[in-house]
A protein has these predicted regions:
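Short, solvent-exposed loop/edge segments of extracellular or virion-exposed proteins
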Residues: 1-4
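Short loop/turn motifs that cap or connect beta-strands within the blades
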Residues: 83-86
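Aromatic, loop-rich ligand-recognition surfaces of beta-strand-rich domains
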Residues: 6, 10-80, 91-144
């Protein structure tokens, strides 16, 4: 996935004043479909994802819905872990998305589906240029 702005390392620096933007051109339904693949470097028992919006950002530039997938080895098929919805303008804390059935994982894929609506809009039946920017991510090891 191409990067429009920011750097991937900004996703894991615990500062949501730094950010990463994928190279998409249309929102609120993202086009082209964009995803972020993360190689954790080792297998963990994946239990939860922490997601934090970029600070001081307009809500319509924040991700509303994303799909989460994971796999243990590079040659495995992706396991669908579900679609998740973020709360708009919540930038001070991570929003936590637990995995229903934690699994051994080395690779995580986040597919960005659509953004929050622009003020005054009530549904996703419009299109405009724009992007999504992500502040920070956390990957939690399941430990029970």
């Amino acid at each position: 996935l191409g990067t429009k702005e920011g750097d991937l390392k900004n996703l894991f620096d615990d500062k949501n004043s730094t950010f990463w933007c994928p190279d998409i051109t249309t929102r609120p339904i993202y086009d082209p479909v964009c995803y972020l693949d993360i190689d954790l470097g080792e297998v963990i028992k994946f239990g939860q994802l922490g997601y934090r919006h970029r600070s001081l950002n307009y809500s319509h530039l924040q991700c509303h819905t994303f799909k989460l997938e994971a796999k243990k080895t590079e040659s495995d098929a992706w396991t669908n872990l579900g679609e998740f919805v973020t709360e708009a303008l919540k930038v001070d804390d991570y929003q936590l998305f637990p995995i229903e059935e934690p699994l051994e994982t080395q690779y995580i894929r986040i597919t960005f589906i659509k953004g929050h609506l622009r003020d005054g809009k009530t549904d996703w039946n419009y299109s405009e240029t724009g992007n999504v920017s992500v502040g920070d991510l956390q990957v939690f090891v399941y430990n029970r």
